[in-house]
Amino acid sequence: MAPNSVAVTMEKPDNFSLLEINGSDPSSFPDKRKSISPKQFSWFLLLKAHRLISCLSWLVSSVKKRIAFSAKNINEEEDPKSRGKQMYRFIKACLVISIIALSIEIVAHFKKWNLDLINRPSWEVYGLVEWSYMAWLSFRSDYIAPLVISLSRFCTVLFLIQSLDRLVLCLGCFWIKFKKIEPKLTEESIDLEDPSSFPMVLIQIPMCNEREVYEQSIGAASQLDWPKDRILIQVLDDSDDPNLQLLIKEEVSVWAEKGVNIIYRHRLIRTGYKAGNLKSAMTCDYVKDYEFVTIFDADFTPNPDFLKKTVPHFKGNPELGLVQARWSFVNKDENLLTRLQNINLCFHFEVEQQVNGVFLNFFGFNGTAGVWRIKALEESGGWLERTTVEDMDIAVRAHLNGWKFIYLNDVEVTCELPESYEAYKKQQHRWHSGPMQLFRLCLPSIIKSKISVWKKANLIFLFFLLRKLILPFYSFTLFCIILPLTMFIPEAELPLWIICYVPIFISLLNILPSPKSFPFLVPYLLFENTMSITKFNAMISGLFQFGSAYEWVVTKKTGRSSESDLLAFAEKEEKLHRRNSESGLELLSKLKEQETNLVGQETVKKSLGGLMRPKNKKKTNMVFKKELGLAFLLLTAAARSFLSAHGLHFYFLLFQGLSFLVVGLDLIGEQIS
């Protein structure tokens, strides 16, 4: 082939992806570098154009796939008919307005217009654009700024009231510690030598499709140190999986063979969620033989001495209706999300529950790890299905009937924290929408009740309004909406003590019950503001009876508190399989064999040091639209603050925006399998 010839090869006549230009090295013929024919140049341009089109096509295809994947995972946890869409539209509107305002301010900044001077003489204004900008400044100062200032002052007052309440609670806790105040037994209530002196106790374990944890809760309840003839365990299974029902039945039968007084109960008509399950169980004829009832959720594992530390407090105290124990968490150090949850719940139990129990003899029942006097339940109307917070409902009604509560801070029951943000968000939505439902329903009863005026005031203003309504309202409105808007309205700028000093002080108070969490002070402050959108949305849905307020979603469990050696677990499962050879349990035996084989394979794979890779479930990231919208709103406001050199305002908005971004992309906690 001649040195200056060009050969064009194509695998397919309609595809130029394999087109090649074969020619000699131009550097060998410096005198012929410029002798390129028009045909060669055309082929060269065609090749470059094809490569560019291929690259763009690949990018478009990748973007489409990512959008389709994100659309599939966006807010799958929300009801399509819920009012959350209205909140999202509001956030989008604020974001669009802030972007437009930022664009205007950027132009004004580089044009070197005076951003603060409003009353500028008309003869100094040059051009229609600058005149329009000055007109906007005047309109903003006269009409928009006063409204934002009034709203910010109102939220600031609420913020200070709530901060004062938090400070008073901490002082009350300090007084309890200083004076060593704690519930004490006035007399020897139980003769340990005489089993007949032990009162009759009913144990209830409600569960629904909780495969990961049913064994540990049933096992822990079956090992409670109490005379076998003075205790009955009800396993209240609302699972809709027939295979799981068989497994739970088998676990119950295993403990029954060991002499434990335990029964399995499954409802054919599963209505009312947990409240309906408990209500149905209390209608059994044998319940009238029992004096107390203890409730444990499926992931709770009490110590054997739980009943001996709680039930004796009822002796000689006929007005006592509830004894509540503290929660402890087996997975509190699992990830950042569980660490931040631990801070909140440590404050709740160490401070809120303890102070209210000592000074008021009233607090919200936590739904589990508590002992009720059955008479108190019956006189208060029993379990009602009208809200998603049946525990708080029965506690309020019992308080209105004059029953007293005791909280035991030194009696702990181990449980799990949600490890994924999706599970935590659903839990928090239920915990914050239910109280507002309950407040609407209970307000007439509170007003008409015969309790003292100060107890009524505590219920209405502190228990419901301040801690359940005002807290999520001001935290979302002040820090997520007003603060970023004030960056575009300098007349309404918030002082530093509101956005920095007081929040840090309150966060320090929250961390005091868990001092090991001090390094997470800043992440905790940012995350609490991030969760305000979920709590605010839940509060609104509960207050105005939106559809999402009636949703009950069982919090996903991982069973970490029951993890043990896989070989021991496989051996236990194989023994169960051999023991159940009856014809009626053939299906169960097959299921046990399959699970044993799977566990055995997993053990072998681990023992081979990774030579055989186990097939893992695919984990996906959810995309939370409202959190992402607020992230971009705060980052836009941070950019505006940067132009004005606001310092701490900029850093707060920047890190708060990044916090919303991390949560919106589901980068905190475990992903969903």
Curated annotation (Swiss-Prot):
Disruption phenotype: Normal xyloglucan (XyG) levels. Plants missing several xyloglucan synthases (e.g. CSLC4, CSLC5, CSLC6, CSLC8 and CSLC12) have no detectable XyG levels and several associated phenotypes including reduced stems height and leaves area, as well as shorter root hairs and reduced pollen tube formation ability. One of its GO terms (biological process) is cell wall organization. The modification Phosphoserine is found at S581. The chain crosses the membrane at residues 90-110, 144-164, 469-489, 494-514, 623-643, 648-668. It is a multi-pass membrane protein. It is found in: Golgi apparatus membrane. Expressed in seedlings, roots, leaves, stems, flowers and seeds. Keywords: Cell wall biogenesis/degradation, Glycosyltransferase, Golgi apparatus, Membrane, Phosphoprotein, Transferase, Transmembrane, Transmembrane helix. The keyword Membrane applies. Gene3D superfamilies: Spore Coat Polysaccharide Biosynthesis Protein SpsA, Chain A. Substrate binds at D297, D299. It holds the Pfam family Glyco_trans_2_3. The keyword Transmembrane helix applies. Belongs to the glycosyltransferase 2 family. Plant cellulose synthase-like C subfamily. Beta-1,4-glucan synthase rather involved in the synthesis of the xyloglucan backbone than cellulose. Seems to work simultaneously with xyloglucan 6-xylosyltransferase. Xyloglucan is a noncellulosic polysaccharides of plant cell wall and consists of a glucan backbone substituted by xylose, galactose and fucose. Associates with other xyloglucan-synthesizing enzymes to form multiprotein complexes for xyloglucan synthesis in the Golgi. Homodimer. Interacts with XXT5. Interacts with FUT1, MUR3 and XLT2. This is Xyloglucan glycosyltransferase 4. The gene is CSLC4.
